[in-house]
Regions:
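Hydrophobic alpha-helical connector segments
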Residues: 71-100, 122-124, 144-151
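Amphipathic alpha-helical segments used for helix-helix packing
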Residues: 95-113, 160-168
Length: 195
């Protein structure tokens, strides 16, 4: 195979993201990626240092994409409306980009925990969540992080159960999700009263 014209790091990462979304991040291999791109595996090393570097880049791309999605969802919204918009955006990201999402969950396990680019991307994804939580009366960074973890856990857990076929009873999962987010919002309000 001759070198493919137009092949660069961004093209390699985009193809890897598509492969990860089709299968699983864990199953992503440089051999499969090379086949997808129509190049020999050694050609990939002109663009990525190896599978670890590629997965780190997928974490970065995924965090940035998730952050943009959360920012769009939260724009102009506050309170319960903002919480639901964020949770739905998160749930949609899990469904639409499963491999890329998996890379965001594993971001710090895949590379250096002090990686400044990954840290900045995580912070950017967190900003719209913190803004909406502040509109719900959550104050102080520590409390906001606890609440953000709670909201993320709700969206992650629901979406992964849903994707695995875990909701077999004939009830609308969208309504279940809305009720769950409303219960979380109610909990935030009751926690505020106790503080």
């Amino acid at each position: 195979m001759s070198p493919r014209a137009g092949l660069n790091r961004a093209v390699v990462v985009d193809a890897a993201a598509a492969l990860a979304d089709e299968a699983r991040l864990e199953d992503l291999s440089l051999g499969d990626l090379a086949s997808r791109l129509g190049v020999r595996k050694p050609s990939l090393y002109n663009h990525v240092a190896g599978i670890g570097d590629l997965k780190r880049e997928l974490s970065l791309v995924g965090l940035r994409e998730l952050g943009r999605s959360l920012s769009r969802a939260a724009a102009g919204k506050a309170g319960d409306e903002g919480l639901l918009a964020l949770a739905e955006a998160y749930r949609s990201f899990v469904k639409d980009r499963p491999g890329l999402y998996e890379a965001t969950v594993r971001s710090y396990r895949l590379s250096d925990p002090d990686d400044p680019e990954l840290g900045a991307a995580e912070r950017e994804a967190l900003e719209p969540v913190l803004a909406v939580l502040a509109s719900c009366g959550v104050s102080g960074e520590e409390e906001a992080i606890h609440a953000a973890r709670g909201l993320r856990s709700i969206a992650h857990g629901f979406a992964t159960l849903e994707e695995a076929g875990g909701f077999g009873i004939a009830l609308d999962p969208d309504e279940s999700f809305r009720k769950l987010v409303r219960a979380f919002a109610d909990g935030l309000r009751s926690g505020e009263r106790r503080a």
